[in-house]
């Protein structure tokens, strides 16, 4: 039984992690590319952000992470805000 629990934990950890250069990004973070790749926390209210659709094929973002759940990246100001994800 302990072995089954251990296998489940390993699977859960591997699905929530993202390889980012020499680091592995966990939940609540993304891989942001500057001169090198770095794990950064997801952008919060009024932080600068990238849109989820701006991820590279490898899942990395340029400079900033997308917003945390419940927020969206306003493409006019490039900051995380509440409300609809449509630009108006």
UniProtKB/Swiss-Prot annotation:
Q: Which Pfam families match?
A: MIT_LIKE_ACTX
The record, for InterPro entries, names: Atracotoxin (IPR020202)
Domain of life per record? Eukaryota
Q: Report the GO terms under cellular component.
A: extracellular region
Alphabetical list of Gene3D superfamilies matching this protein: Lipase, subunit A (2.10.80.10)
Quote the protein name from its UniProt record: U1-hexatoxin-Iw1c
Provenance organism: Illawarra wisharti
Positions carrying Pyrrolidone carboxylic acid are 18
**Localization, UniProt:** Secreted
